[in-house]
Every structure is written in C-alpha cells, then in structure tokens.
Amino acid sequence: MDGKQTLEQLSQKHKVSVRTVQRKLEKVGSSNLEISGKSIVIMVDAAYWGRSFGVMVFKDAYSKSVVWYKFIYRKERIIDYMEGIDYLVKNGCTIRGIVCDGMPGLIRALSCFNVQYCQFHMVKTVHSKLTKHPKSEAGKELLAISNLIAHTDKESFVGMLDQWYDVYGHYMNERSVPDQSGHTHYMHKRLRGAYLSLRRNTDYLWTWYDNIVLDIPNTNNGIESLFADLNSKLRVHNGLSLKNREKFISQYLKRKQ
C-alpha cells in the first residue's frame, strides 16, 4: 500500500473491484517476524485505536527495524511485554538495552536488562500531574526541573531535586485537618505524585549515559514516529473492518522489518 491510498483508489489503480482489494488485504498474514540472533536495543510501546484494540511493537534502535509485534484487545499488561522479550531471547537475540515508558511494574520486571525510562514520557507524566501552568511556586519550580531532564546530567538533576525538597518538602507533605474519623490526607497530592515519580525513576532516566557505549536512545521517539506514520495511513482507510485493519497493520509492520 503505497502512500495514502483509499480502497477506491487502489481498485482504480489496479482495475479491480473494491471487494477484490478487500480480499487481497485479508490474505495478508499476521505472524511473528522472522529474525536471526543479533545484538539489539529495543524501544517498546503500544498504540491504541479505541479502548479494546491496539498493537504492541518492539523496534530495534540499531537497525531501525520492527522485531516483534502483537495485537492486544484490552489494556496492555506486563506479561505481553515479557512474551515479546521471551520471543527475542529464544530466537538468539542479545538484548543490550530496553527503552520503555512508566507502566507500573514494567521496569522492575525488566530489571535484569539495561532499562532506560523514556525521558519524554517522564516529562509528560509530570505535566499531567502539575499541568503546564502550576499555581504554586513549588509546582512551578518542580515543573521547570522536570523540563531539564533531557538537558542535564544525573548528578545535577538529583542535586536540583534535593534542593527543591529542602525548600518545599514541608509544603508538599502538608496534611489536612483530621476528619470525624481521625483520618487525614495529603493537601497537595498531585505535587507529591510528580515529585515521587521523578525521585523513584531517577536511576532509570540516565541509563543511556551510564552505558554510553551501547548507544541506547534516551527517548522512545523512534517508535512514536512509527506510530504517527501508521496512523496517518490508517486515517485514509476508515472503512476497514477490525480484521482488515489488523491485516493492514501487519503488512505495514512487516515492511518495517
């Protein structure tokens, strides 16, 4: 499927009916990609169309090729990622590093590898908690620190977080007046969540630098651009059924092998 061509355009180009084009699409298989043993650094992520259909993709940062994918029909799970890892290992691949987002428990599950937390996703997580325009000075300064992740080193970043906590730690940990049951809650939950997320994942934000000879990307931009291109092609094929959409995506990803 070259460029942005609708079913009608494809039928006109090849002088066949739209139904014939659809049948051709249905013949495209959906199977694991054939790979041979090699050293790889994989960028892993999933894209969704609606709440109950998506595809998980592993892309090698060295060769820029897709090395594994899987369709999913509910929210992604750690076991899905481990299935892909197992497939690559069994096919003789040596995984030098993994770039991923902050799915709860995923980094721990992959801890036997060099795991790089996507710096872009980290900043995005902080933005989602603080918004782009926090009202408090604590929020403004923490947001500014998070925006420096891709422009500073680990030691400087940890130093900035420590200084921020020295100034705003008490404010961040303020609790409410006890209710009738004696329970209290944190007054600044989103600020606290943003800080703890940064602190908890600091060790994985500079894996690329700690293992610089492995040439691990610091973000998942390589796989995000693949999803953006795939989406642009799918938008002009809105008439595809779920089955044919899977066939289309399979063909697209196999061409990226």
Q: Predicted regions span which residues?
A:
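Short, amphipathic alpha-helical "recognition" segments used to contact nucleic acids or chromatin
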Residues: 1-5
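Short coil turns linking two alpha-helices in DNA-binding domains
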Residues: 6, 17-20
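Residues within the helices of the helix-turn-helix
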Residues: 7-12
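RNase H-like nuclease fold core
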Residues: 13, 20-99, 104, 108, ...
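Acidic/histidine-rich catalytic cores and adjacent linkers
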Residues: 93-103, 110, 143-257
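Conserved beta-strand -> loop -> alpha-helix junction used to position metal-binding or nucleic-acid-contacting
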Residues: 97-143
